[in-house]
Amino acid sequence: MEKLVIAGREFDSRLFLGTGKFNSNEVMEQAILASGTEMVTVAMKRIDMDDKEDDMLKHIIHPNIQLLPNTSGVRDAEEAVFAAQMAREAFGTNWLKLEIHPDPRYLLPDSIETLKATEQLVKLGFIVLPYCQADPVLCKRLEEAGAATVMPLGAPIGTNKGLQTKEFLQIIIEQAGIPVVVDAGIGAPSHAAEAMELGASAVLVNTAIAVAGNPVEMALAFKAATEAGRRAYEAGLGLQADNFIAEASSPLTAFLE
């Protein structure tokens, strides 16, 4: 498979993982390693910034994994910039998953504040990966603002409903000049494969793995599905017929004559 490149860094894995909702840090770490991921995002609000030996960080930081702090919980661009600067100081990284969702019930991203924050953070030297609505116009504006990727949602966070925004994702992928990472709503390995078959650069999964009966096995399933979907995309999927008339793969016409 082709390597994924974000801000000049190469990734072999196209499966990114979130770290919420696991029943223990040990299970979380096992799932991370089983998935083969090289990008793990963690909410700053879950980390004790004053404790360099925070137990959770011990289970996340590995040599081949890019830590991606996120700003989940902030309500506007001003709070996002403040949180980003704290993250850079605490973790020593310019990488940032930008999340601004002021409504705590649906956790839908605020498009206006997300674009505003992206513009400011890029100027401050951050590598910005914004979580956003599956809005083709917005995604293009974020790209023009200097975002390293766009991360449009497939469905609301934690719903496991799959690619409810599929048609919009197709447009976003088609017109993007930067990687497109489908984030939120991916609830089954088949959803991840579908996103990759569309041409998404990567997928970010959290809830579906964390709340599974066996998170480690589910991480392995998502790893396989993500790879399969990407391989299918690179191989070139056959066109779907626009009707239900069958076409034999091995015609017998000449044989019967």
UniProtKB/Swiss-Prot annotation:
SUPFAM superfamilies: ThiG-like. One of its GO terms (cellular component) is 2-iminoacetate synthase complex. InterPro entries: Aldolase_TIM (IPR013785), Thiazole_synthase_ThiG (IPR033983), ThiG (IPR008867). The keyword Transferase applies. One of its GO terms (molecular function) is thiazole synthase activity. It is found in: Cytoplasm. CDD domains: ThiG. 1-deoxy-D-xylulose 5-phosphate binds at residues 158, 184-185, 206-207. The keyword RNA-binding does not apply. It is an enzyme of class 2 (transferase). Catalyzes the rearrangement of 1-deoxy-D-xylulose 5-phosphate (DXP) to produce the thiazole phosphate moiety of thiamine. Sulfur is provided by the thiocarboxylate moiety of the carrier protein ThiS. In vitro, sulfur can be provided by H(2)S. Homotetramer. Forms heterodimers with either ThiH or ThiS. This is Thiazole synthase. The gene is thiG.
